[in-house]
Amino acid sequence: KIMTFSNLCNEIFWKSTTDYHVTDSVDAPMNNPYELKTIEYYLYLKNWIDAVQWHFEDIIRDPQIDPVEALALKRRIDKSNQDRTDLVELIDSYFLDKYKEVKPLSDATINTESPAWAIDRLSILALKIYHMQQEVERTDTTEEHRAQCQAKLNILLEQRKDLSTAIEQLLADIEAGRKYMKVYKQMKMYNDPALNPVLYAKK
């Protein structure tokens, strides 16, 4: 099997997802096995952040959660969202650098999303697939529940296959100059004191 970029992503995302679930703790330290500042390192980190955030969202949905804990958790979710966005931008900068010598064709078009935002969705899919697989493998549920989850799992696997193909097509188009990358800085307003009214009112 040729190691395409999407294959690399899926492999690393799956490793990170399964590594996270060894402890299944939002406070567990991350042991990133890849060399610092490599694209592999950032892909592993990306999925780890997504896995932690997935479980933050589970915890905060608990109706019995203590309000003080909920507020502290909300702040951690905000920080996690910011980290996630920063990392997506960093992954896009990898592609911008990789394809900087490519001259777009005169009729080149722009894609609706940058490569890294598509890769972001691929990372979330790894988590969805993992959790759906857990449901399929449960022995304390009905056969009907397992069958429903298996049907959902099949759709998620098909979605991952299609999204991986679309990412490969996009990267091939960028490389050939048929498409060009344009990255807009994501303005995450809730963390920026200059942009969030509640924060700048406190100055």
Tell where the protein language model's regions lie, with residue ranges.
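Anionic, Ser/Thr-rich low-complexity intrinsically disordered regions
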Residues: 2-203
